[in-house]
Design a protein with these regions (language model features):
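N-terminal targeting leaders
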Residues: 4, 9-181
């Protein structure tokens, strides 16, 4: 009886989580199959990066969208940067790789918090604009640089990049769009 009571308390959480996942999947412009493929590819890319035995000073973050991989973070030197690219390109299913890692020390926790706040501010501004579907765009921030990826038309891409470049705190915007046909 106690187990039944405990399990029934979990039901609302399971239902809410399932509804959230379903809504996010439905809003994404990629097909469900593409979303699953990207999720699987992201796991394989992460594994390849961890197996590449990059030095502990390297902080490489991968973002996968439409089979394309965007690398951000910090690496100690160009050799490590090239090793990260090589590791990603060895993964079957990677269509294209943008290596936007920067040479230097890893960013501080304070900068990571600032970047999270900046990304949230950008997403809010994009969400409030009537001509942008936030579900089509991924926003990645790294040391006040903003990296945009997603499925857009050339005009949408220009408009979003321009809007993001005017957000307070943004030092630079780099786009890695997949263009709609």
């Amino acid at each position: 009886m106690l187990l039944l009571t405990l399990l029934s308390g979990c039901a609302p959480a399971v239902i809410i989580t399932s509804a959230t996942v379903a809504a996010r999947t439905a809003a994404d412009p990629r097909s469900t199959g593409r979303q699953i493929d990207d999720g699987t590819l992201a796991l394989r890319v992460s594994r390849a990066l961890s197996e590449a035995a990059l030095p502990p000073q390297a902080r490489v973050v991968s973002t996968v969208y439409q089979g394309n991989v965007l690398l951000t973070g910090e690496v100690p030197d160009d050799a490590v940067r090239q090793a990260a690219t090589k590791a990603v390109l060895s993964v079957s299913g990677v269509s294209h790789t943008w290596n936007e890692t920067r040479t230097g020390s890893a960013i501080s926790t304070g900068q990571k918090i600032s970047d999270a706040w900046l990304a949230s501010d950008i997403r809010t501004k994009l969400l409030l604009s009537s001509d942008t579907r936030l579900s089509d765009i991924k926003v990645i921030t790294e040391n006040s640089e903003v990296f945009l990826t997603g499925l857009v038309t050339p005009e949408e891409g220009r408009r979003v990049a321009d809007r993001v470049s005017r957000v307070s705190g943004v030092r630079h915007v780099t786009t890695a769009w997949t263009l709609k046909q």
